[in-house]
Curated annotation (Swiss-Prot):
Originating gene: RSH1
Domain ACT intervals: 809-880
Keyword Transit peptide among UniProt keywords: yes
TGS domain sequence ranges: 574-637
GO molecular function: ATP binding; GTP binding; GTP diphosphokinase activity; guanosine-3',5'-bis(diphosphate) 3'-diphosphatase activity; kinase activity
EC number: 2.7.6.5
Stated name of the protein: Putative GTP diphosphokinase RSH1, chloroplastic
Length: 892
């Protein structure tokens, strides 16, 4: 007898042991089938330790029947001497359920379910066989008879197309074997079965059957697929082939490392799915079947494939809302990557479930009775089911890692899921909407049990980006056992369907369209014939992140390697997320730890380039503020700042940008601004680059470090690098600011305009002299606020006859907020500055204000004052200067 699927030679590094035998004998033969009921990887010796050492499943718990040449047909008797069995396995971690009243009851015990009903959800499957000779009987017709029940929801003409695709795939793969020794055709048929379980349209299923034909054979071409099955099937198969074939071609190039080849492989997959979403849906089904049969790969490849699945494909399934596939991918990946923790955690969950089985059943009964007695639910719903669900194993593991808890400290593993099937709303009134029914049930749950504060999550009012909708609450069902917490999820039948299938529901059944559907137009139907409707808004929300991938590719082509591109997607899109709101209530999701800078560039590149400040929940915050869930973020923009100051500000933000896309956009902006300042900057040097004036080297002087070196050195450098220009004098008359002791004006203060002058190192300059050092944020007063030219005459004064007095100007651009003038005034006073006068004006529309101070103070105090002012929250830029002009000194 040949080793079964799930068992290989004992000499292999990934040798397996069969943990059970199916004692069901085939009709016409007396020998039993040897099979592994559990997933193949569980049988590996490295995993058969601890809890898994005794995980021997009884085949009486499995449902298997043969059909055709060794293929299962549910509900039919065995017809011939075939030797391939299909073991149906419903794993308690993911599929446990029980109902109240007429609903099915199932509780997980050990590794599978003890069932109180005859129906067991056949979700995860393991194939086993007794002899390789059995595969000689496989034919297109026997394969079709096995596949057909899974796609029976299709129309007859659609079934014909799928049947033709199966025959073509069989012809193309005839004679090919998988690593396990089974015919290769089994793989595409199983991919098609997975797609059928999600009730995908016939084009997706046909593409699943044909996805390897062009890559692995010479007899099938894209043109043939298009001629026989249409352009949509070709587009999906072409997207699949581009991904797989590219990696194989690049592997032949010795100059490319395996990491580079894999990165380019993933890059092409991401780009292909932006053109056709079903490319990734078929790819997920392909990866899922490969994970189910991963045991035949060498152990080092098992780990690498499981790692890639966990980092890329499981998060992609989550983004698409396909939680059923996402859960199994995470489960299998966790099992291969960390078998020790997997076994320990699985045993802990089983022990907890057994320990609380009685309490869980009692809670279910109490809730079921309360629902049955509710007259409102009886009026507006056809049926309400209550199911017990064990939390996903990998989800529990991540929670334990996040809280830095040990596996033995885990307590919460059970959930109750309430599924409501509403009646038609005709004539009943507005309270019968699906959302209102869910909120009503939430009130019932909180009326029975004590909810845990801040543990209610409303994903109905604010759905997740992948379309997931549900109400979550955590309660304490028994006050005498306060450590036993129970999560309750409330959703309608349609919400549950979308939660399981996600974007696949849009491509369900016959009513699929290639683009976003029109509002109210059916996009498919489920196996019960119920119409599923996804309007434009819902569909756009689910695939909005695909647009981001497309934009990154278009914007950063040539500037980002394949590794960087894939890293951007895996970190920025597929990692942990935080959800925030725009002022209009739109949901935006960013990677966990993202700042306001990331949010601004997510909205639009120009928004990020012009951002000067932000408000979170109505409060002014710094652009480097780290965002938290449910915050409302408003960006304040201002485009009148000088190129140099914009450069400096964005340079500071660069290190606080979480997303790679935001960092790339900032570096691009910095290069543009550096060009405006006649300076060079590269991506490698951006963190160390300091923008200076064009002729800075002619004027810069060394300044002794001050007491507060960290805060004042930059301002000393900026002030020293500024230039003095005097009317028509040549550039050699320019003097550095450092040599200006204190600008002085001859004469005393008068309201009339007089010729003014300043003394610099004992020399007096008169007439058309003009001194300009406006930095770092404002290039001229007109750029600060357009209305500055039109200020009232009473706000403009001329100074003269003030010999012996120092005059300085400080202009501040800031966000318009309460208390800003007081804070700036306090900062100036604290630095020893005497404020002579101040005037302020604001632009209500943009929320920007300008303050112009006339003050007296020594040069050293000005340096400290500039540093202190810049530390004030909401200050966008400042400028200092003194002016002497025949037309007078502008001062407010």
């Amino acid at each position: 007898m040949q080793p079964p699927t799930g068992a290989v030679s004992g000499s292999s590094s990934s040798s397996l042991e069969c943990v059970s035998s199916c004692r069901t004998s085939w009709r016409g033969g007396g020998r039993p089938y040897e099979c592994s009921v559990l997933s193949c990887a569980w049988n590996a010796p490295r995993a058969l330790t601890g809890a898994l050492a005794s995980t021997t499943a009884q085949c009486s718990s499995c449902s298997h029947a043969e059909a055709g040449a060794g293929w299962r047909r549910r509900g039919q008797s065995q017809r011939s001497n075939n030797s391939l069995l299909h073991i149906t396995w419903a794993e308690g971690i993911n599929r446990g359920k029980f109902g109240y009243g007429s609903s099915a009851h199932s509780f997980p015990t050990g590794n599978f379910f003890k069932s109180w009903s005859t129906s067991v959800d056949p979700t995860w499957r393991v194939f086993c066989y007794s002899s390789s000779e059995s595969f000689n009987h496989i034919s297109p017709e026997t394969l079709w008879e096995d596949l057909k029940p899974a796609i029976s929801y299709l129309q007859p003409e659609e079934l014909n197309f799928v049947h033709d695709a199966l025959k073509l795939a069989y012809e193309a793969h005839n004679g090919q074997k998988r690593r396990s020794g089974e015919p290769f055709i089994i793989h595409p048929v199983e991919v098609a079965r997975i797609l059928g379980e999600h009730e995908l349209d016939w084009e997706s299923i046909a593409a699943g059957l044909l996805h390897d034909t062009v890559e692995d054979t010479d007899m099938v071409t894209f043109e043939r697929i298009e001629n026989e099955f249409g352009v949509t099937v070709r587009r999906i198969v072409e997207g699949e082939t581009k991904v797989s074939k590219l990696g194989k071609l690049q592997c032949k190039n010795e100059g490319n490392s395996k990491q580079d080849v894999k990165a380019e492989d993933l890059r092409q997959m991401f780009l292909a799915m932006t053109e056709e979403v079903r490319v990734i849906i078929v790819k997920l089904a392909d990866r899922l079947h490969n994970m189910r049969t991963l045991t035949h790969m060498p152990q080092h490849k098992q780990y690498a494939i499981a790692m890639e699945t966990l980092q890329v494909f499981a998060p992609l399934a989550k983004l698409l809302g396909m939680y059923r596939i996402k859960s199994e991918l995470e489960y299998l990946s966790f099992m291969y990557m960390n078998p020790g923790d997997f076994a320990e955690l699985k045993k802990r969950v089983e022990d907890l479930y057994k320990a609380h089985e009685q309490e869980l059943e009692e809670a279910n009964q109490i809730l079921g009775e309360k629902i049955a007695e509710d007259q409102f639910l009886d009026l507006v719903s056809v049926e309400t089911q209550v199911r017990s669900v064990c939390k996903e194993l990998y989800s529990i593991y991540k929670t334990a890692l996040k809280s830095k808890s040990s596996i033995n400290e885990i307590n919460q593993v059970a959930q109750l899921r309430i599924i409501i099937k509403p009646k038609s709303c005709n004539g009943v009134g507005p309270l019968c909407t699906a959302q209102q029914i869910c909120y009503h049930v939430l009130g019932l749950v909180h009326g029975i049990w004590t909810p845990i504060p801040q543990a209610v999550k409303d994903y109905i009012a604010t759905p997740k980006p992948n379309g997931y909708q549900s109400l979550h609450t955590t309660v304490i069902p028994f006050l005498n056992e306060s450590m036993f917490h129970l999560e309750v999820q409330i959703r309608t039948e349609d919400m549950d369907l979308i939660a399981e299938r996600g974007i696949a529901a849009h491509y369900s059944g016959r009513g699929v369209v290639s683009g976003p559907v029109r509002p109210g137009i059916s996009s498919g139907r489920n196996s019960n014939g119920k119409v599923i409707c996804l309007n434009n808004t819902g569909f756009a929300l689910r695939i909005g992140w695909l647009n981001a991938i497309r934009e990154w590719q278009e914007e950063f082509v040539g500037n980002m390697s394949s590794r960087e591109f894939v890293d951007t997607i895996t970190r920025d899109l597929l990692g942990s997320r935080v959800f925030v709101f725009t002022p209009k209530g739109e949901i935006k999701n960013l990677p966990k730890g993202a700042t306001v800078v990331d949010y601004a560039y997510l909205i639009h590149t120009e928004i990020g380039n012009k951002m000067v400040a932000a408000k979170v929940n109505g409060n002014l915050v710094s652009p480097i503020h780290v965002l938290a869930n449910a915050e409302v973020v408003e960006i304040i923009i201002y485009d009148k700042l000088s190129a140099k100051y914009a450069f400096q500000r964005h340079q500071q933000w660069l290190q606080h940008a979480k997303t790679r896309s935001a960092r790339h956009k900032i570096m691009k902006f910095l290069r543009e601004q550096a060009a405006l300042s006649a300076a060079e900057i590269t991506a490698d040097a951006v963190n160390n680059f300091v923008a200076d004036l064009e002729d800075e080297s002619d004027y810069e002087q060394s300044i002794p470090s001050s007491e507060n070196k960290d805060y004042t050195f930059n301002w000393q450098k900026i002030l020293n690098s500024d230039k003095l220009s005097f009317g028509n004098k040549k550039s050699d008359c320019f003097l550095p600011v450092k040599n200006v002791s204190v600008p002085k004006v001859n004469g005393k203060h008068n309201k009339t305009v007089k010729e003014l002058g300043i003394k610099i190192n004992g020399s007096t300059f008169r007439g058309d002299s003009f001194t300009d050092f406006i930095h770092p944020g404002v290039s001229s007063s007109k750029e600060v606020l357009p209305s500055v030219d039109n200020w009232k005459a009473g706000k403009i004064c001329a100074w003269h006859n003030t010999e012996g007095s120092s005059i300085q100007w400080l202009c501040i651009v800031c966000v318009d907020r309460k208390g800003m003038v007081a804070e700036v005034s306090s900062a100036l006073t604290a630095c020893g500055i005497t404020i002579c006068s101040c005037v302020a004006e604001r632009d209500k529309r943009r929320g920007i204000g300008v303050m112009l101070f006339h003050f007296e103070g020594a040069y050293e105090n000005v340096v400290s004052a500039c540093s202190g002012v810049d530390m004030i929250l909401g200050v966008l830029g400042w400028s200092v200067g003194c002016s002497c002009n025949p037309l007078g000194v502008l001062e407010c």
